[in-house]
Amino acid sequence: MAYQAPRRFVMWGALVCIACVLGLMARAALFGGVAYITTTDGSSNGGDVLCDGLPPFVVVVDAGSTGCRAHAFKVTPGTVAPAFTLEPAGARVKLETPLASLAGKSEGEVSDAIVPMLEEIAARVPAKDVPNTPVYVWATAGARALSETQQQTLWSTVTNVVRTQTQFKLPNTADSFQSSEENHFRTIAGEEEGFFAWLAANYVSGVDVTAVGTSDAPRSEETVGALDVGGGSAQIVSLLAQGNGGQSGNENSIGSSSLDELAKNVYVKSYLGVGAAHAERRARTEAAADALKNYKKETTFPCGFKGEVEEVDGVTMTGTGEYDACVELIQRLTATKMKEDGVKSVATSEYNLRAPDSALLPINKKFLGMSLLFHATHFLHVAFPGSLDSFPEPSLAEIGDAGRKACATEWERIQRDVDGVDENTPTDRLPGRCFDTALIQALLGTETGFGFGDDEQRISFVDDVDGKGVEWTMGAALSLAHRAAQHSVGVETTLACAASSSGGSSTYKKKVAVGIGAKSRTGRTIRRWVGFLCAAGALIALVAALAGAVEADKMWRLTKPAERIMGPGGIAMRKRGSLSNF
């Protein structure tokens, strides 16, 4: 039988080609995800997306130290520009993974973590408005703890993921306004976070500070202060009293012409490392270190519920539920942290958090205590009925009494009777609630805290006001929309807009999604399975081609030279100058 080399080579070549095609299909399915093309769609002022005027919605993602929370806000223009109103567009979307924990991860891992959250929050916005809705992913204390290099790499990855896998509005990459895009994905300073929280606290309380510079500007005494304690940091924000903070204009009204100018008259202080998660970790770590210095493998911890056991750095730590001792421990650690950071109080020139009197005067008739301040006091109120009846406006003295009762409760009883009672206290946070209640006293009191007296009852511990959440993300959305509104009526702002904003126009590139099932979770699952099957097919085809090549080489070596060109028996197989039957 004649040697069939050419036909076999054609077959093996085809297998290699099939392997290559399947490999490319696998790569596209596994790593391509949703793709977008750009089409020209009307005109844009270029630069910052807010230069185009008030957006229909704004999405702000709070990338905190304990997880991410995405918020969508609806922006409605007022009857007279530049007035507008802002309200939440549905419930926030939570992601348990802290963004900072994704530092150093691949783009695929970052995508898997944040894209489902962004898709879900996009569903809060009408489909036709998503391409005109800007998104801002802003990180707080957790990301501030990363190095500058880690942050830059993380933000570069996040930017690429959001730009290529969502339809939210972002600055054109062709524009020379790189800082505009960077503003969408960045780590914000603690002072910014605090100011945004203050804006939100006032807005939901009926004090529209975005009306500054108009005849509708609120009166100074109407404003409220904001206190915010998270997992990594704590902030206090308050409009300074007249004569102590540069207040100008009519003594009863806010004289600032813009939010940027108003920020200069607001006392904003943010303290990194004194939030609940960071502070408790440090307290337990130091307690374990002290035990190891004395060659002990067991020790007690005053900030744990009585009998609660936890192992830290190889040391078994048993809670004793001593509330007052816990407060003193936190006060000492807070002062130590301030000394390490070189931060002294402007009021006392000592290493503490004390705010100046001008920030605490009765001009701020009320302060709103947010985030952990609400969660911890609400826990005391619902988990120990009757111990905090004055909630949501208890004094520090009343919180102290309730905290002593809670911390002294046997851990076994806490697990049996308290776990699951408070919707804001998940099981994994329950052991830390004794510490949290003591932290309130330490951070708000007069020893090392902000300076509130034990018997004062002007702090409202709230999660929302009239159904509106009190979170800094709302303040951020207010600030962004305010700039857009002012720019739309010709008021000078800090926005980086192209020169064409005064009359000309430039091409605006709109992103359009392409691909089947590109945006849905089901679509991604289908793509992965298709990718795996294509990859498997490519591997099988390649192995078959290689096996065939090896077999061909063996046959080639065993075949007589004459038979490589002639048929068996040496009979010439040439016909019309070509080889046949091969």
Which residues does each predicted region cover?
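Short loop/turn segments immediately following beta-strands, especially the blade-tip
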Residues: 75-82, 241-242
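Membrane-embedded alpha-helices of multi-pass membrane proteins, especially ion channels
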Residues: 19-34, 541-551
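A short acidic Gly-Thr/Ser loop motif
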Residues: 61-69, 227-234
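Serine/threonine-rich intrinsically disordered cytosolic regulatory regions enriched
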Residues: 572, 577-581
